[in-house]
Amino acid sequence: MLFFRPSAHRAPQAKAFRFMSVCWLAASMLTLPLVGKAVAQEVNLYTVREPGLVKPLIVAFTAKTGIKVNTVFMNDGLAERVGAEGARSPADVMMTVDIAKLLEIVDKGLAQPVRSATLEAAVPAQLRDPDGRWFALSLRARLIYAAKDRVAAKPLTYEELADPQWKGRICIRSGQHPYNTALIAAYMAHHGEAATEVWMKGVKANLARKATGGDREVARDILGELCDIGLGNSYYVGLMRSGAGGPDQEKWGKAIRVVLPTFSNGGTHVNASGVALAKYAPNPAAAIQFMEFLVSDEGQRILAENNFEFPVKAGAPMHPLIAELGTLKPDSLPWAEIAKYRKAASLLVERIGFDQ
């Protein structure tokens, strides 16, 4: 009987072959997910903005880039939710309204810096964080609504609202509303707390009715001759005059003349909507691409068309109903400086009984 012993020199070859096969298989397994990610990019957006505004932006962005946007809509509590989710949060981009909300995101350490030549070229320096942790997208101005037939067509300042000539002629919503506490905080940043208290008491003395309702009700009461002037946001003018709120609101909007007031030592008070890149964004490159789209001409046009806000990008198209309001010259006071006075503004409203 013959016995065959395997050749000793073949064993190393077999081992080498098996080793190469395992390496090839491992490389293949690593490569497949990478290919999948390149083909199917996505962005996770958390926002408090209305679906009717956000969805056209998403459709246009996806059509342009092929990147899918998964959106979580919420009424409020964006910072609280992202903070609670921690490092496991799927959020890439956070979109919100009110500069105080953007600063809250930064203060809670929920955003990461973005360095983008596109964003920095489109958004003026005073409308973005110096470290790139948030960027404004659109602006709403705090305006004066005035009766066309009872108030002379001339420039006005916020300071003049305390002038006795307006006694019994001013309508305004609650002083505790964020629109007004932001304005009061800006006044404090310009003039100090003591001067602001004197001003607020003067405005209160000039009220035609209790500080209540909303900005559109200010226009309604001007039409009804309950008051002659009042404070309201710019986008409500477009909303009313467009007829989107119904025929009654269209009448209110067309009954007023709009004044772009300024501080005596500054510009028009504005607030903003804006975006930030989440600290633990799982898709940062695609997220930045989405943020850059939002400040492109197309993104700014969609924002303006659907929300009656002023674009942040110079020369970007705006809705005709907003363009006709005149040239906006935003106050240059840094928002971080204004934010320091938000609590003091609220306490002042309470202390003097402004809403009583």
State the predicted function of each range.
Residues 34-40:
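Sec/Tat signal peptide C-region and signal peptidase I cleavage site
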Residues 41-103:
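Early extracytoplasmic/lumenal segment of secretory-pathway proteins
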Residues 46-49, 112-120, 130-131, 134-135, 146-148, 153, 159, 247-269, ...:
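Short beta-strand->loop
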Residues 89-94, 112-144, 159, 170-172:
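A structural signal for short loop-to-beta-strand junctions that line the ligand-binding cleft
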Residues 143-150, 270-283, 302-303:
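A bilobed periplasmic-binding-protein/Venus flytrap-type ligand-binding module shared by bacterial periplasmic
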Residues 186, 191-261:
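Ligand-binding pocket segment of bilobal, Venus flytrap-like solute-binding proteins
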Residues 293, 297-356:
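Extracellular/periplasmic juxtamembrane helices and adjacent flexible linkers that interface
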